[in-house]
Design a protein with these regions (language model features):
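Short, charged/polar micro-motifs that form catalytic or ligand-binding hotspots
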Residues: 21, 47, 331, 335, ...
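The feature captures the catalytic groove of carbohydrate-active enzymes
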Residues: 367-389, 441-503, 514-584, 759
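Non-catalytic carbohydrate-binding regions of carbohydrate-active enzymes
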Residues: 486-520, 581-610, 629-749, 753-754
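Bacterial Sec-dependent N-terminal signal peptides
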Residues: 1-30
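Aromatic- and histidine-enriched alpha-helix N-cap/loop-to-helix transition segments
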Residues: 339-340, 390-395, 407, 475-483, ...
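Well-ordered alpha-helical scaffold segments within catalytic/enzyme domains
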Residues: 326, 347-352, 398-410, 483-496, ...
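Alpha-helical packing segments of well-folded alpha/beta enzyme cores
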Residues: 309, 341-344, 348, 395, ...
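Aromatic-residue-lined binding/catalytic grooves and analogous aromatic/hydrophobic interfacial grooves
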Residues: 30-458, 556, 578-648, 690, ...
Length: 787
């Protein structure tokens, strides 16, 4: 009997051992899924720099629990004041009695990515925060096993007028050159019907009027789009079981505020709070009426709101993803981190899916008190560096290009239609200043289509061209609009959308270069073109770096690619008149320029230039974004030489902020270099929420840092040329990955790579399987010779 028992114990031990061995092996082989990437915090936060993002539709929140109280800042797309500061809508503080969050043990805060909400749990009390994707409403739902009293306070630092002095003006369009005293005017805040109503209403006169006068556009002012005059934004905080409970004053971080409290009529186990937001440019009576109508409509029509919002987020995550892990690893190592941060940053982009205005590169909807970025900047939570209504094109493009391969075409409309709305104002610039056609867009662009007034420069020579920025960085940098033209064209190329509404815009941008550089040439001499019949693109600019450039390669690449893509449209999509014009224009575009380093031919920044002013690498723009050079395309070696031997390209190389070296390396098939720079780019930030990078060159969270990182990872996994889809053009064999990305011709590509082997290959439509070329572990020479 004893022998049998010992034998049984021995067998059981071995069975358990084998089970654990298999379990360990199985665990090692697993690639993370979305749920694994949910940020989960087991302790409360010290301040808003340790907050968690939340949002939906066009609303963003920073959520944190501090000293037992729940706080959140909330922001919305398009809330620009008179000076073009992107104002937050306020801060909410939630206190519970008795307080379930008073203890250190048992706290849990989680961002549930799949369903798009934040959950906070402790002592049998759960708070769920979520934002309606389809209507501008913030929800807070409390569920407790015991009755609690809730006090929800709307806190505003704009309870009074505030002077804006010195560096505080970097948050608005005046920057370092304010014209007179700049005042952030107070909001209107009051209790109404057991709720709190709050709004900011712009005056009639704004920075728009100042800029129009500065830039001598007054003759056409009445024709121009003015998005700021009388703009009114705010909302109403309310709940079924709440009553007004007085005001209080306080100071949070460096800023005094006034609080307006709502409290539970009676303690309850279930309580809900809603913040309804509304923005419009109509009169204040209409604004009030429309807000009230929106609230009453929501009571009857909003019953499916939570289900619809969850469904939207579920579809969002199913549309595209990149899940990563090192081979045979279960640790949250550097490769795991870049997969998590890819998802977290894409979530942040999804929070402004349908904003009237694009997601801002310098913080998006998730900025907090500036002292946590720079202790010398003790300004209000409205502060961000590089302005609110100023859209800097070279930064903005990196926020929106990742949406192409992630298939988020619906989310790109905010950025593309933003430009479309400014076409008239940009064309008026050409007509007023130079009496020719075309849309004249600049790099640092106000939300009304004129150059930023500080960058335009107030202290100018009297006879200086009023159409020009008097600015060493930005002068003659007109070509950055073409990357948004590229995105417009990609809506058709990738998603098959009808893009005819963009045709006149794109052609107008091309026409500006055609007519303006002939105009400049005729002012220098008798001929409008060079001896080969080409435009003389002088003075020009290679990004902000190569100044007073002659025939910058970044400009030439843009003109060549955009014109060619337009001419690929069918006769139904492009008129004969436009087609004939583009064919003629195509003959006037000059060729690219080259130079040599130690006998190696490389792409040049331009034919010539007078000085170097910044640290971009536009000599590699023919690689990205323009795709003239790359894997499967002619003369890849010249582009590789540019990476390897161009001394400026080497000197400027970095992963910080808007730097694109991770993208260039991926496009060139340089697996080791792409891995290095993407690990640096997409590794954890030094903040509690790992995708709050920055400030880099801009602000926190740096969205062009995250956007360029997303692009780099996508390009490591999937590229296209000549109708072929290249898998793993720069992906290390030792990194497991499960990804789903979008390609041209309405194609989705889903692949799972485990231990260097393809486990899943799902292509829709299936007929595109014939176009797949697997480049995993291919040598540099094999990639160069690929046709």
């Amino acid at each position: 009997m004893m022998r049998k028992l010992l034998k049984y114990i021995f067998l059981m031990k071995n069975t358990i051992l084998i089970f654990f061995l298999f379990a360990t092996l199985f665990a090692k082989a697993q690639i993370p899924v979305l749920e694994n990437y949910n940020p989960i915090w087991k302790t409360q936060s010290n301040n808003p720099s340790e907050s968690m993002p939340l949002g939906g539709g066009d609303i963003g929140l920073n959520v944190w629990v501090e000293k037992g109280d729940l706080y959140f800042y909330f922001s919305r797309s398009g809330t620009f004041d008179e000076h073009n500061t992107l104002l937050k809508l306020g801060r909410v503080k939630v206190s519970l009695t008795p307080n379930p969050f008073k203890d250190k043990e048992g706290f849990r805060q989680e961002l549930v990515l799949e369903d798009g909400y934040v959950s906070i749990i402790q002592n049998n009390t759960k708070i769920k925060l979520w934002v309606d994707v389809f209507k501008p409403v913030i929800h807070l739902d409390l569920d407790s096993k015991t009755t609690v009293k809730m006090t929800a306070s709307y806190e505003s630092w704009r309870h009074k007028n505030r002077d804006s002095k010195g560096k505080a003006n970097n948050a608005n369009s005046y920057k370092w050159a304010p014209q007179g005293e700049i005042v952030t005017f107070k909001d209107s805040i009051a209790f109404e019907n057991d709720g709190v109503q709050f709004y900011h209403r712009n005056r009639q006169e704004t920075v728009f009027d100042v800029t129009v006068k500065q830039q001598k556009m007054e003759s056409v002012k009445d024709q121009m789009l003015n998005p700021l005059a009388n703009l009114t934004f705010g909302g109403f905080m309310t709940g079924d079981n709440f009553k007004s409970d007085g005001t209080y004053s306080g100071k949070y971080q460096d800023t005094d505020f006034k609080g307006f409290s709502l409290s539970s009529v009676k303690p309850s186990k279930k309580q809900s709070l809603e913040l309804h937001l509304y923005t419009n440019q109509n009169d204040i009576n209409s604004w009030n009426t429309n807000l009230k109508n929106q609230i009453s409509d929501y009571k009857t029509k909003g019953k499916q709101a939570e289900k619809n919002t969850i469904k939207w987020w579920n579809n969002f995550w199913n549309r595209s993803f990149i899940y990563t892990q090192k081979n045979q690893s279960t640790a949250k190592d550097s490769v795991y981190q870049i997969g998590q941060n890819y998802q977290l940053f894409r979530y942040m982009l999804g929070c402004n899916a349908y904003g009237k205005y694009p997601t801002k590169f310098n913080g998006g909807l998730f900025t907090v008190d500036p002292v946590f970025t720079n202790p010398d900047l003790n300004f209000t939570p409205d502060f961000r560096n590089w302005g609110g209504g100023t859209m800097t094109a070279q930064n903005q493009r990196l926020v929106y290009f990742p949406m192409v391969k992630s298939g988020d075409f619906d989310m790109m409309k905010s950025q593309l239609d933003y430009y479309l709305g400014l076409q008239k104002n940009a064309e008026l610039r050409s007509q007023v200043y130079w009496k020719h056609g075309g849309a004249a867009f600049t790099e640092q662009l106000e939300n009304f289509g004129l150059p930023n007034p500080a960058e335009y420069e107030w202290k100018r020579p009297a006879d200086y061209d009023p159409g020009m920025e008097y600015n060493a960085w930005l002068e003659y940098e007109w070509d950055t609009v073409f990357e948004f033209c590229q995105m417009m064209l990609q809506q058709k190329e990738f998603a098959g959308e009808d893009i005819q509404k963009y045709n006149s815009f794109i052609i107008s941008c091309l026409r500006f270069f055609d007519e303006h550089y002939q105009y400049l040439a005729k002012h220098r001499g008798r001929k409008a073109l060079d001896g080969n019949g080409h435009l003389i693109l002088y003075p020009g600019s290679g990004a902000e770096t190569y100044k007073m450039a002659n025939n910058a390669n970044s400009t030439i690449s843009a003109l060549q690619v955009i014109t060619k893509q337009l001419l690929n449209l069918s006769s139904k999509e492009l008129s004969k008149e436009d087609s004939n014009y583009l064919k003629g224009f195509q003959t006037r575009i000059p060729p690219l320029n080259f130079r040599t380093f130690d006998g190696h031919t490389t792409l040049a920044p331009a034919k010539s230039w007078e000085r170097i002013n910044n640290s971009e690498v536009p000599q590699l723009y023919p690689v990205y974004p323009w795709g003239i050079y790359g894997i499967g395309k002619p003369d890849l070696e010249t582009a590789l030489n540019t990476w390897k031997y161009d001394t400026d390209a080497i000197k400027f190389r970095s992963h910080v902020g808007w730097k694109q070296d991770n993208i260039f390396a991926a496009r060139l098939g340089l697996t080791n270099e792409a891995a290095k720079y993407n690990l640096l780019k997409m590794g954890n930030s030094d903040r509690r929420f790992p995708a709050f990078w920055g400030p880099g060159f801009d602000w926190v969270p740096d969205h062009n840092w995250g956007g360029s990182g997303m692009i780099g990872m996508q390009e490591m996994l999937l590229q296209e040329s000549n109708g072929k889809i290249h898998l793993f053009p720069a992906w290390p064999k030792g990194w497991d990955v499960h990804f789903k990305l979008h390609a041209t011709q309405n194609t989705t590509v889903e692949v799972e790579l485990v231990n260097g082997e393809l486990k899943v290959l799902k292509i829709i439509p299936e007929e595109r399987k014939k176009d797949i070329i697997n480049l995993l572990n291919k040598s540099a020479e094999e990639k160069i010779n690929l046709k």
